[in-house]
Amino acid sequence: MNPNQKILCTSATALVIGTIAVLIGIVNLGLNIGLHLKPSCNCSRSQPEATNASQTIINNYYNETNITQISNTNIQVEERASREFNNLTKGLCTINSWHIYGKDNAVRIGEDSDVLVTREPYVSCDPDECRFYALSQGTTIRGKHSNGTIHDRSQYRDLISWPLSSPPTVYNSRVECIGWSSTSCHDGRARMSICISGPNNNASAVIWYNRRPVTEINTWARNILRTQESECVCQNGVCPVVFTDGSATGPAETRIYYFKEGKILKWEPLTGTAKHIEECSCYGEQAGVTCTCRDNWQGSNRPVIQIDPVAMTHTSQYICSPVLTDNPRPNDPTVGKCNDPYPGNNNNGVKGFSYLDGGNTWLGRTISIASRSGYEMLKVPNALTDDRSKPTQGQTIVLNTDWSGYSGSFMDYWAEGECYRACFYVELIRGRPKEDKVWWTSNSIVSMCSSTEFLGQWNWPDGAKIEYFL
C-alpha cells in the first residue's frame, strides 16, 4: 500500500468512527431529554436521602443529580418553613445518676492527626442532631502555629462545630462565626450564633441567624466584651443571652439581651443581688431559663440569673448552699450566702453549671479546691434556697489526678419524653500552663446525661500522654 492509499484508509476509518460518535451523542441527548420530560417514573431504585450536592454526585449519574438536588432543596425549604419555635413546656427528668453521652479524645487523636487546637468547648442540639462546639485557634495541635495558643484572644479564633464524639479536624469542622467568645442556640426553626472579636478596648459582637449576619453590638465599657461560652436557650423564638463588659476583678457592666431571629427585642442591665457575672451556663424548663455563672471578682459561690423569656425580665442571686462550686475556693463553710459572694476565690474562677430543681438539684465542681483538676457531681437538695443544704449523693466524673477545666449545661429539647434530660460537658484541658513541656494549650471533651437509674461511675480523663508529643 503506497503512502496515498494509507492516508485515504486512515481518513476513511476516522470518518466512520466520528460518524458513530455523533450518532451515539444524538441517542444520548434524546434519552436525556426523554428522562427529563417524562411525567412519572416507576423506578425501582430508591433515591438517596443526601441533600449535599457532592454526596449526590457520588451516588448518582449526572443527569439524575440535578433532579435529586432540586427535589431535596424543595424539601429542605418546606421543612424549615413548617418547623415551629421551640417551647419549654416540660420540667426536668428525675436525676439519680449520670451516664456517658459523648467523648471526642481530641488530644489523643491529635498526636498523629490533623486535630484543631480548641478551648471553651460546649454542646448544643437542634431538631436533627447534637454537635460539639468550641473556639478554634486556627491551627492544629502538631502545627507550628500552636505555639502561644495559651492566649484567649486573637484574630485566628473562630466558633466551630463538628459531629458528636468525633475530634475537631480540618476536614469535619464547620465554622459558625469568627471570634474569641461565643454562644449558640437553636430556636426550633434556625440556629443563632454569636461571636465576639476585636481588641480588648473595642470589641464587638456579630449575631448570626440561619447562617447569615443579622445584628451587631458594640462594646459599651471598652473592656473585653464577652458572653457565655456555652449554649443559649430559646422560648417561643425569644433567645436571652448574657453579656458582660468590664473588669474581671472589679465591677463590670452585665446586660441580658433578648433576641428573636437574630434581632434585638430588648436589653436590660443586670438586676438582683449578684455582684459579678461571667460565662453563664443556661438551661430551660417550664417556660423559664436558669443560668449559673461565674463571679470572677469575689465569689466562690456561683451567681444565678433566672430569666423569664416571655416577660423579658430577670432576677439574680447566689446559690445559697455552703457547697461552694467555683475554683479556686476555700473549704466548704457551714452556712452559705444567698445574696452576697462568699470570699476566697482570689480574683479568679472557672466556668461551671448546676441544675437547680428543688429536691432534684445537682451541682458540678472540680474536686480540687486550688486547681482545675478532677470533677464531681453532687446532689444538693434545695441548694438554691437553703443556706445549710448539704450533699446527699455524688458521682465522680474525672479523678482528681486528671485535669479538667470549664464545664457547662446543655439539653436536647427535641428528644422524645415527658421531661427534659439534664446533660453537661467537662472540658479536659491539656498543655500549658500546667504541662509546659509542650508549646500548645488545647482540650478534649467528655459529656454526660442524666439517668433515672442508679448507675455505676468511672473515671473519664483526657487520656493523652504528653511525652508522646515531645
UniProtKB/Swiss-Prot annotation:
Q: How is it modified after translation?
A: N-glycosylated.
How is the protein disposed in the membrane? Single-pass type II membrane protein
| Reaction(s) catalysed (UniProt annotation) | Hydrolysis of alpha-(2->3)-, alpha-(2->6)-, alpha-(2->8)- glycosidic linkages of terminal sialic acid residues in oligosaccharides, glycoproteins, glycolipids, colominic acid and synthetic substrates
Names of the cofactor(s): Ca(2+)
**Where is substrate annotated to bind?**
R119, R153, E278, E279, R294, R372
Which intervals of the chain are annotated as region Head of neuraminidase? Answer: 92-470
Biological processes per GO annotation: carbohydrate metabolic process; viral budding from plasma membrane
Give the start-end ranges of region Hypervariable stalk region.
36-89
Q: Which residues bind Ca(2+)?
A: D295, G299, D326, N348
Q: Name one GO cellular component term.
A: virion membrane
Q: What is the top EC class of this enzyme, as a single word?
A: hydrolase
Question: Record keywords: Metal-binding included?
Answer: yes
Co-factor: note:
Binds 1 Ca(2+) ion per subunit.
Its main localization is virion
Q: What is its EC number?
A: 3.2.1.18
Q: Where in the cell is it found?
A: Virion membrane; Host apical cell membrane
Q: Active-site residues?
A: D152, Y406
Gene Ontology terms for molecular function: exo-alpha-sialidase activity; metal ion binding
Record keywords: Calcium, Disulfide bond, Glycoprotein, Glycosidase, Host cell membrane, Host membrane, Hydrolase, Membrane, Metal-binding, Signal-anchor, Transmembrane, Transmembrane helix, Virion
The record lists its disulfide bonds as C93-C419, C125-C130, C177-C195, C185-C232, C234-C239, C280-C293, C282-C291, C320-C338, C423-C449
Task: Provide the assembly information.
Answer: Homotetramer.
Described by its record, this protein's role is as follows: Catalyzes the removal of terminal sialic acid residues from viral and cellular glycoconjugates. Cleaves off the terminal sialic acids on the glycosylated HA during virus budding to facilitate virus release. Additionally helps virus spread through the circulation by further removing sialic acids from the cell surface. These cleavages prevent self-aggregation and ensure the efficient spread of the progeny virus from cell to cell. Otherwise, infection would be limited to one round of replication.
Q: What else is known?
A: The influenza A genome consist of 8 RNA segments. Genetic variation of hemagglutinin and/or neuraminidase genes results in the emergence of new influenza strains. The mechanism of variation can be the result of point mutations or the result of genetic reassortment between segments of two different strains.
Protein family membership: Belongs to the glycosyl hydrolase 34 family.
Record remark: domains: Intact N-terminus is essential for virion morphogenesis. Possesses two apical sorting signals, one in the ectodomain, which is likely to be a glycan, and the other in the transmembrane domain. The transmembrane domain also plays a role in lipid raft association.
Name used for this protein in its record: Neuraminidase
